[in-house]
Curated annotation (Swiss-Prot):
Substrate binds at D82. This is Tyrosine-protein phosphatase 27. Residues 1-114 form the Tyrosine-protein phosphatase domain. SUPFAM superfamilies: (Phosphotyrosine protein) phosphatases II. The keyword Hydrolase applies. Its EC number is 3.1.3.48. It catalyses: O-phospho-L-tyrosyl-[protein] + H2O = L-tyrosyl-[protein] + phosphate.
Length: 114
C-alpha cells in the first residue's frame, strides 16, 4: 500500500485468484467487503465488491499517514485456468475495458499496478 500511496496509483489488476488447484497463489492484501485494515500507517477500507461473470471489482478508500485519501479500484480476473491460458480473450478484454473506464472516471493517468 505504501507504493500505491507514493505513486498515487488508482487501479490494481490481478490475474490470479488467491487459491488455485488447492495451492495458495496470492497473499490477500486487502480487507473483506465493508471492513477496514491498517497496514503500517496506511488505512484501507473495502467500500464495495462487485462480481461480474469473469472478474471482480473492489473499491477501496486508502488514507495515508498524511491523511491523503485515494480511491483505488482493484480488478481481479477470476477465469484464468489453473494451467495454461484462457481459451478466448473476450473476458480479458471485458475486464480491460472496465479498467480503462475506471481510469477515465478518476481522471488519472498514474501507473496501474499489475
Amino acid at each position: 500500500w505504501q507504493m500505491i500511496v507514493e505513486h498515487k496509483c488508482c487501479v490494481i489488476v490481478m490475474l490470479a485468484r488467491e487459491i488455485e488447484a488447492g495451492k495458495k497463489k496470492c497473499e490477500k492484501y486487502w480487507p473483506d467487503a465493508g471492513k477496514q485494515l491498517r497496514f503500517g500507517g496506511i488505512s484501507v477500507e473495502n467500500r464495495q465488491e462487485v462480481n461480474y461473470s469473469a472478474f471482480r471489482r473492489r473499491v477501496f478508500s486508502v488514507v495515508s499517514e498524511k491523511q491523503e485519501q485515494l480511491t483505488v479500484y482493484q480488478y481481479q480476473f477470476l477465469k484464468w485456468p489453473d494451467h495454461g491460458v484462457p481459451q478466448t480473450t473476450s473476458n480479458l478484454f471485458r475486464m480491460h475495458r472496465a479498467v480503462l473506464k475506471s481510469c477515465q472516471e478518476l481522471g488519472n493517468d498514474n501507473p496501474i499496478v499489475v
